[in-house]
């Protein structure tokens, strides 16, 4: 996966959303489907969870800082904490999408920024302000870790 190589060169990886959780089993059809069937059944299969793969790849290394997002309608903190653990990331930004004035198709958001120790509620505000807060947290995490330049990129080996 190319992203694993590129992640080795990054100080932080912020994955705003899954590209798709599912895809059609067998991929695109090579021929046009006839319209003579009264019903059609599609079988969907899970796609690779790129953020979880990054978390597994990183393992115990401290770089890059990994940030994921979770669009939730209830139990924001508990569901985001579960993602923090299962995906092995440093931060999860849990967006409360149960409100009409926050989340999708509006310029405002309500979120909770969650790490291993804290859950910081972010009140209704602009998405730009939320992004600034997330980047501030990433910067804080980076300042507490050894420089990424001291870590060999993926695929390189010390021959000494």
Regions found by a protein language model. Give the residues of each.
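Small-residue (G/A/S/T)-rich helix-start motifs and N-terminal tracts that mark the onset
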Residues: 1-12, 89, 96-160
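Glycine-rich phosphate/dinucleotide-binding loop and adjoining beta-alpha-beta core of small-molecule
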Residues: 1-104, 112
